Amino acid sequence: MSEQEGNQSEHQSEHVGESEGKLPNETPTTSQSTNASTGTAGKGEKKSSDGDPAAANPATKLTPSMAESLLELNPALRSELAGMDKEKATEALRQMNISDLLTGLSVNPKNQKDMASFKFWQTQPVIRFDDRESESPDGPIKIVELDQVSREPIPLVDGFEWVTLDIDDEADVKEFYELLANHYVEDGSAMFRFNYSPAFLNWALKAPGWKREWHVGVRASKSGKLVASICGVPAEIAVRGKSLKVTEINFLCVHKKLRSKRLTPVLIKEITRRCYLNGIYQAIYTVGIMLPTPVSACRYYHRALDWLKLHEVGFSPLPIGSTKSRQVTRNHLPGHTSTPGLRPMQSKDIDAVQDLLNRYLKRFDLSQIFSRKEVDHLLLHKEKPGAEQIVWSYVAEEPGTHRITDFAAFYSLESSVLQNSKHKNVKAAYLYYYATETAFAEKEKGLKERLLMLINDVLILAKKERFDVMNALTLHDNPLFLEQLKFGAGDGQLHYYLFNYRTAPIAGGVNDKNLPDERKRGGVGVILV
């Protein structure tokens, strides 16, 4: 399962194998555009005519010089087309879905590093860039013969050995936490770093059906120090209506001083081997950079809950012509929620939430299918003395009938502030899953209005819990409310990948200008923590 690494501002190598060894699913809260005024992007630009093929697919207008620039930003794509002359490469690009590809590029060019030895990726069952327009049906790229899968671990370079991380062992969890804290994802300016607490790791890595052998570590043989990791958890997803048992890959991390040891491809091969032995032949993962080949790409958006603090830590700049007090006022939220019957989720709501959420998610081309146990583990906080809360979930209960009509959740992932004398952390909430019965009305009548009210209430509740920012992607039905609820565009992109499964590109909620577009909904409906 090819979980990748990155060094990106919203989740981001030289080579796979010589790279920075990091692969997150979210990113530290860094944005130079957060909560600048929204709604003005694209003014003065002409809309493409639906009847103009060139307008519909910008690739048809590519010149050789434009193609050269595109390839410069895409080491992966450049590797795929190596050996072609400029005209042939340009023609090859014209045949690809460049509109989707451009939308999928990170907004920040410095995030486009080569994850390379694409010799490695060419050996893996992943979609090639030049296969985007393939007429091949959806399905596995490679049929795995279980009797040909090695029972022995992939050999490591001398001086290192495989270990299984014990998430139940306090010492192991502490060491894993320290590896991630010091060597996992930072933003591009090295101002923020994820702070994965032991409680978060237990929540993320011990979902129902979790397997201890999928928590893979590498130690230095002499010192016993943990120097690398890659993890997986089982899940069931639906791809265009077809159910798949997959592994969600996460926490690929290599110690900064060991990124010349070619550990990354070995980690990928080893987690793949272990999953194959358990009869799981597909995986899903998210990366902030472009690799072969994303099935979708979503953009990050951020909503300030404590704008002044975000400004003081360097997250939210002061827009030209504005003042601090004006920005604080602009981001003010009401003191009370508006959704009738809204209350914290309880254990008695599990069945109703599972039913509502799964029906809601069926509307998307790529979505998770939740079991009752997964709803219980991932979406319901259990009150325990001294226990850290990771997820906050709410339901709207209809008066009289007591029917659950709405559900919404967010989870917490704190980021450490690395270079600030006043603040040591940013408390970030991530918009998680939500669902509403309004989605099933004819022509989705009232859906936008309902979500504007429901998610605004989520912002209010997160503010009351003293969160500083709410992060969200352009997936689910988020394009209906992001800009109106004052979410600001971030500088990061999150690409979705399927390992050993081919499907056509899936909408990521953004248009060709990389802006939220209500017409681009219905694509991504799965969130990897």
UniProtKB/Swiss-Prot annotation:
Record field: catalytic activity: N-terminal glycyl-[protein] + tetradecanoyl-CoA = N-tetradecanoylglycyl-[protein] + CoA + H(+)
Documented EC number(s): 2.3.1.97
SUPFAM superfamilies given in the database record: Acyl-CoA N-acyltransferases (Nat)
Tagged with keyword Transferase: yes
GO CC annotations, alphabetized: cytoplasm
Basic and acidic residues: compositionally biased ranges: 11-23
GO molecular function terms listed in the Swiss-Prot or TrEMBL record: glycylpeptide N-tetradecanoyltransferase activity
Main location: cytoplasm
Keywords annotated in UniProt: Acyltransferase, Cytoplasm, Transferase
Annotated binding of tetradecanoyl-CoA, by residue: 118-121, 252-254, 260-264
The keyword Transferase appears for this protein: yes
Top-level taxon in the UniProt lineage: Eukaryota
Active site residues according to the UniProt entry: 529 (proton acceptor)
Polar residues biased stretches: 1-10, 26-40
Region (Disordered): 1-65
Pfam family, one: NMT_C
Cellular compartments annotated: Cytoplasm
The protein's assembly and partners: Monomer.
Function: Adds a myristoyl group to the N-terminal glycine residue of certain cellular proteins.
Sequence similarity: Belongs to the NMT family.
Protein name from the UniProt record: Glycylpeptide N-tetradecanoyltransferase
Organism: Ajellomyces capsulatus
UniProt lineage: Eukaryota, Fungi, Dikarya, Ascomycota, Pezizomycotina
